[in-house]
Amino acid sequence: MKLIKNGISSKDESGEVILRPEEPEDMWHTYNLITPGDELKANTYRKVVSTSATGSTKSEKRKISLTLRVQEIDFDPKEGSIRVKGVNVVENKFVKIGASHTIELEPHRNFTLIKSCWDTIFMERLKLSCDVSKKADLAAIILQPGLAHLCLITSHMTVTRAKIEKSIP
């Protein structure tokens, strides 16, 4: 994971960080950093409906930046994506304050995480996730008749990279 900006106050341990997950394990760390009540700022797409002077409507998807107060977090390890559901806290041209929305976090896309208190557990996870020397990988192949799984093992998770099935007569 790449730490783009660290804006955590040393006085009250509040503040924000801008992060860019770069691999599946970074998504796991991201999932463990975000908790309900945090604020998350990221780019997303929203369907915007506009009405013309004649009364006809036109809808289009627009890329917008939203800041959500996190209510729920879902992690899909197979896809390497995180869905964050929450309520908009910063009004913009297309989304009002209080509107519900879901942001999907993906590798190689920056996001800003704002916490009222970065405690020692979150600080350790942040430090660990950004430390390249801690990411030693091990590959494992699990075999049984007619089936093989190729897995990558890191210090925090196991990722299945391939499943090979072959019928044996």
Residue ranges and their predicted role:
Residues 1-149, 153-169:
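Extended, charged alpha/beta regions that create polyanion-binding interfaces
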